[in-house]
Amino acid sequence: MAGARAAAAAASAGSSASSGNQPPQELGLGELLEEFSRTQYRAKDGSGTGGSKVERIEKRCLELFGRDYCFSVIPNTNGDICGHYPRHIVFLEYESSEKEKDTFESTVQVSKLQDLIHRSKMARCRGRFVCPVILFKGKHICRSATLAGWGELYGRSGYNYFFSGGADDAWADVEDVTEEDCALRSGDTHLFDKVRGYDIKLLRYLSVKYICDLMVENKKVKFGMNVTSSEKVDKAQRYADFTLLSIPYPGCEFFKEYKDRDYMAEGLIFNWKQDYVDAPLSIPDFLTHSLNIDWSQYQCWDLVQQTQNYLKLLLSLVNSDDDSGLLVHCISGWDRTPLFISLLRLSLWADGLIHTSLKPTEILYLTVAYDWFLFGHMLVDRLSKGEEIFFFCFNFLKHITSEEFSALKTQRRKSLPARDGGFTLEDICMLRRKDRGSTTSLGSDFSLVMESSPGATGSFTYEAVELVPAGAPTQAAWRKSHSSSPQSVLWNRPQPSEDRLPSQQGLAEARSSSSSSSNHSDNFFRMGSSPLEVPKPRSVDHPLPGSSLSTDYGSWQMVTGCGSIQERAVLHTDSSLPFSFPDELPNSCLLAALSDRETRLQEVRSAFLAAYSSTVGLRAVAPSPSGAIGGLLEQFARGVGLRSISSNAL
């Protein structure tokens, strides 16, 4: 155990030799990434060359799951169920902690689940069936591929029939066939009814209600043939009882542009006018009211905004009051799907809601190994083509650190009672980080943004109150800014000249980060309404507990949202403030600034970047033989008038 932690710490420091001092039964993150970038995982190869490494990765995942959950294992030895799913598929039953074990518990019987999996596996592309991977408040968050089209379905059915000696092993056991099943088997859609019927049974057994489809197509068209379908265009409306959400998201080939732009996702917008893009965004109205997002503008969002808003939607679904589960899928389920499954897992973990005992390096290992490697992401192929969706996933953590992505159900302060004395520094100090806003106005060194909830009477608009120091030129600034967070806190502190720190760069970084934040910044009003009062000093006779006198504050100016100075207030040197500024970083609530969530996600991202740079690295694009062949075939298809798209199936 200590060796694993030491290896994780070494990986987070960027050491390529992180495996040197760890016991042979465990692999560090660096070795995991090396194996991942060297070969694609296949369940049937687990006992062959490199099998010992894969076995250690699998055992490490089981050990990490076992820290917080009681689980069963569905065997997939040699890929009998699916060739690119884990050989040990983990089914989480309940949290093992004393506090939670009696709160939420799965009602699923593993034997019946296993039977439904075997029966339904051909319903989805590449046999990638609906698989539960996250347990949150008793709800199963699942992943899969999209529905198989008739070509794949009949092809696999014939293959299985031929190689099983004439017996269709998926339907060999028919002792529990109901009258409803018999009725479904009539007519020309016999096979579709059968396999999709079992797929629906599996979804219902896992209590899945919401199905989120990330495909930009209604049906995947390849060389002029429909190779996959999706629930939203099922002609028989078999999935009508589920809540279907079409949230089109660019495929892995789009992330070639992300790499070519120096890994800058800000400003990178998908071309929605391509001929194969025919799946519009479609979300039931009752699911969007609480999110305050203008979904009609989705085609104008850049990659950061789109990913942020989709993640907010998924978090709102899993955090709803009902007990309904969620399915996320794309086409093959090994690029876009693990992206959002990983972001969900890491976001909920950062809130302390799942995997509560895992450290940042441990949750990172589990996410990379289980959500990406063991579920068949083709990192080798993606790296050769420059399609770095895997790197994007973990680098993107800097954009979801703020509390607006938190699933914790805390009561927001929607309004404050009017008082004659205005706002005191204690009021600012007691505001949650979520309510402090961001540095969005030019020239501001500190801004306080009071957020309003839609429809809340008496609440504040998005109006900034900025406190700008007006002291002597010798004043220096202590700045706390985190470019990884959409919201930053900047506080000016006078210091001796020798303590002066470069400030312009930090301020620019903070503003750059703020500008990339979802569509949050679009909701700021700069109308110059009546400003709030400057925080007033408390009486010396009534200091706050833990406060101290300070003599280095000088005067402060009040600036409205439009930037005009309204009035001046002076904080006298004998004023008692609700916090003090020692030479080292204080533990006061205003400068404790980093929330647990932000700290955790930053540590995960830092550990990933260190390990990735020392193993995989940010590579130049190399030509892919398979890509060249696919390109020639695509050109041929276009030449004969067939409708087709890129050869990369996601």
UniProtKB/Swiss-Prot annotation:
Disease tied to this entry: Myopathy, centronuclear, 1: A congenital muscle disorder characterized by progressive muscular weakness and wasting involving mainly limb girdle, trunk, and neck muscles. It may also affect distal muscles. Weakness may be present during childhood or adolescence or may not become evident until the third decade of life. Ptosis is a frequent clinical feature.
Residues bearing the modification N6-acetyllysine: 194
Organism of origin: Homo sapiens (Human)
Annotated Gene Ontology cellular component terms: cytosol; perinuclear region of cytoplasm; ruffle
Modification Phosphoserine, positions: 518, 530, 580, 624
Binding site for a 1,2-diacyl-sn-glycero-3-phospho-(1D-myo-inositol-3,5-bisphosphate): 333-336, 382
InterPro entries, A to Z: MTMR14 (IPR039802), MTMR14_PH-GRAM (IPR039803), Prot-tyrosine_phosphatase-like (IPR029021), Tyr_Pase_AS (IPR016130)
Protein name: Phosphatidylinositol-3,5-bisphosphate 3-phosphatase MTMR14
Swiss-Prot/TrEMBL keywords: Acetylation, Cytoplasm, Disease variant, Glycoprotein, Hydrolase, Methylation, Phosphoprotein
GO biological process terms held by the UniProt record: macroautophagy; phosphatidylinositol biosynthetic process
Glycosylation sites: 226, 519
Segments for region (Disordered): 1-27, 476-546
Compartments where found: Cytoplasm
